[in-house]
């Protein structure tokens, strides 16, 4: 079924540009296609996508609900982002490569069976793919989705997918967020469909018809981990977390309301009803744990289960602590619901194994304590308890191994918030002392439970506790430094190293604490007693809180429940008290440990050793005996301590010991500030603790985590020194704001700045020295290089001069011919050069030949690179002249005078010019805008296309109105003297108006001077002519002539296929004319050259020609009045003769022109001649020279006694000029000819018969400027009417014999043949005069549109240029043979009279100035003109045949029939003259019978 039939049957439509524009108009889009970014083509019945090439800016294209079967036609839509192709007939996804920015693709309801060609390599930003309701079936059809790395929305609903392996495909789609699979069989086949897909797609947020919430994902992960039970628990946790969140928001509102009410009117807080059972279970478990003296679970509750509360009041916090309504599940679920701060594990930093406790205890026992007397305990009464919250709790680990009962101690330390490095200490202080805290905190936890009973024993052993704390600090520090010495690269070691450096930096400020007197220790007992009373008060207070909460219980309890709740209340009260005590003890312990560690830095080992008394040494020995550690461990620890002491000796030297006696009042007054600051530090230190995301193993302790997860979750923060904060903390904590302290700080800063300044000065000095040495080195190198460069330049110049000279000499030699091996046997041939591979590449054999220095350097660099990397392509074959030309052009440019003007322009002047141009452009834009605004009312009407014209349709009346004319063009110059081409041309008289003003008639002297100048500058003249020709070729402005004559050109060139020419009797006259091709060209050129000189210039030129011809040198004559009078008289006579002849020709009735028909060309052909010669131009040059010479001989002979020579020679002068002009134009073998006219030399050259046109057609082709041509044509028409139709074929057979050199032909035969040939020539001449213009649209346009150029000067230039060329070519040519043969022709034609010696001499000399010599008179009557034309035609043909006989026995050269419009310039220095001898055969018309044989001797000049 054909395409057209299918279209008719289906009724489908095509996308056409017109239809698309109509749709744009309907949708109120732009009519210019590229301005639209959307296009609505849905519901149109289109069967294919086409004609969208112009819509290059489209971003959205709607094509749904059509009949499109193939994706195509999108090649130009590179910016398309959305393509909607649903409800079509598409079977394959293809041809989307050009749409690289496609984001959304909808292919629903098509016939697609496989997803393909949409990978990231083709559609790199594809985000949404909708491919529902297709024929997708299995995982193979979806396998290409893995390549879609950016696809996040995928709709596969209502397909036929039943393969469960698609889950693996979705698992590999990293960006998939939305997936729609409903309507596929696989939904029912997948077990646990929704959970499976949620687990497979990590980023999935929407599945089928509802979102994927975080709760869904958590339940799915729990189901994967623990089955349905885990899923149920996880679901309950989320539900409780949601209820808890709601309850907390309500309780917060109740608290805000209660804060403004009296206590008796306050509302109770809400409690959880569904978690009562969990609460009872928890309280029972706690009670049992307390009775069994096990606090592991209690500590877990402390570290993990504290309710989150912001910095609220202590009342609300304690109420929340006493609620007891929350469980571990509640808290975890709540944390999970707040995804911003997920905390699935205890917020602890480091947990250590049990062995750490033992090793620390051993280290403590084995180490000798120092400086026990300096231990200071502060008054505890100043310390306010800090409420422990889960976010703020210091992260201290507790290992589940109870310590030995003997080592249980309660440590009460001096609480100080002192720090000197701000943020560094905040982040590190809790992490660094983890081991110490583990030991001490376990001790605290176990002892605080029985704190009421053991309070007295605490104060008894306080001295021992003080020593234990000191030993613990020393042990930690020494152990960390031992690890540093052993270079154990673990996290603990790195942190210890950092904290040691920090302590050393701030050691200088810590000396105020180490020397306090022993009397401060007297405060210990009072402080402890005060603390005990404080604890008991706090205990009572907490009991009251619990009792109040209990009263607010709304439910009635049974007796057992009441008893159980009383036990729970007791346990809760203890727990609350213990929590507060632990928090306070922790802060005191931390402060004491930090202060003790800092004090150690400031001590020197020698002073400590001197300060020890015998009692202290005995006490240390006693302690060492009491410690239960083995002697081996004690010895090892002593060795390590010796290493550390040696290291600290070097560090401690040079540090001065400062003793500041600060009173107890000052200490107590600064305690409040220190407490507040340390509380802030403690809060800030716990802010950056990394939280672990809830996941697998959330309930396990962090000691059981794998090492990789520890590193991921607990990253180390960078330690950065902050000097500004350091100074602030020093001043604020230590209150060292005295004048001396400030002076010391200033001195230290000054010293530091001085050191930095000295270092900078030294660096600057080094840089200056380096720069100076580099400058000196560069100077020495440059001086050396300049010498080398000068030597190389001179050498290269010499080489280049020699090579250039050799190259010139080589060019002057004649071409040599290479012969092959002469011997028969190549193997033993000595003359045959063996084919060996050259070692040096040809491009490097003569690298400097004809090259500049730059090219030589480039060649050398290419050679070096080729040697370094042989795989690189060889770049040595560069054009050797391009660089030279560039250098010469640059030199000429530097010498030009315009550069000075160019450099004279400054930036200001150029900016001012640019500003003027911008201002001018703004004015034009403003004017255009004003014009448009003034006509705004008109443009409310609509534009419609009426009869292929754009018309204005009035909105109110509906009338049609023409468009207003466009505004006149504004010229760039905006000047009134702007000349255009139209100003120069004045139609009507065919003349030209000179653009430089009207020239007066020039005198003879002026004309002669101009001619002499032109002769001297002959090369320039030829170049100018070439330039003028180029200029003429550039002046082509329209293609109308091509459309008018295109068909005729095609027909003409088709008929130029001369193989198809048939010889016929009707074409014999045209064939005869074609033999005198040069005469034909003369006719063609005569019209265009005849009237381009005015009469006065023509007269003067002809007089000068005669003078130059006779004397050989132009003589400057003084103007004489008589000669001028004679010239004027002759001019008047000639004008009268022209008028009479014109009148006679007008009386002759002309044929009535018939209706013009299409121009057709007939075919005809003959063999003109063959030229067997390798010299391309000289043979023809001789032919032209002989031709003009013969014309001169004939005219001289016929008009010896004629006294009106000067007047009549003007008639013949254009003929001679034209023949000379065309001598170089007719044949140029160097220029490649047209394809249709490129003949082989052995083929027969066929001739085109001229077209038979009516006189009306010919006359219509003439322009008004050719009156003189018309006169000659009318005269020739008479001969045509008399002779053309009486022409018989038998005469044509005899015509070829008339062209030979035979002197036996009689005059009457020749005359009759000549008359008939003249008729054909006349007919052909009429056509040929205008044929080249008729076929050349450039000529037509040049003459009709632009106006003819002033061809007078051009013709003079051409004449003299060709005279010089011909003169130089024929300087040494001997014409004896040609002269004799020509003389025979003249004798046979006009009688027995001979040329005398002077005429011979003149004729020989005539070859030197061939075109300067005037031709002599032709009779004015038509009869004499006919005879002359007959003789001329015969002689021309004979001479051409003679010239073609200058041959060498080589391939023949065919003469082409199309003239070359450009001039061929021959260099006279390249000519060579040789004597040649050849045999000449004159053939008949068919070219197969030899009519006559001649032998010719001549001297020939050739290149």
From Swiss-Prot:
Residues 1303-1314 have a biased composition (Low complexity). Belongs to the DNAAF1 family. InterPro entries: Cilia_flagella_integrity, Leu-rich_rpt, Leu-rich_rpt_4, LRR_dom_sf. Cilium-specific protein required for cilia structures. One of its GO terms (cellular component) is axoneme. Keywords: Cell projection, Cilium, Leucine-rich repeat, Repeat. One of its GO terms (biological process) is cilium assembly. Gene3D superfamilies: Ribonuclease Inhibitor. This is Dynein axonemal assembly factor 1 homolog. Residues 1014-1031 have a biased composition (Basic and acidic residues).
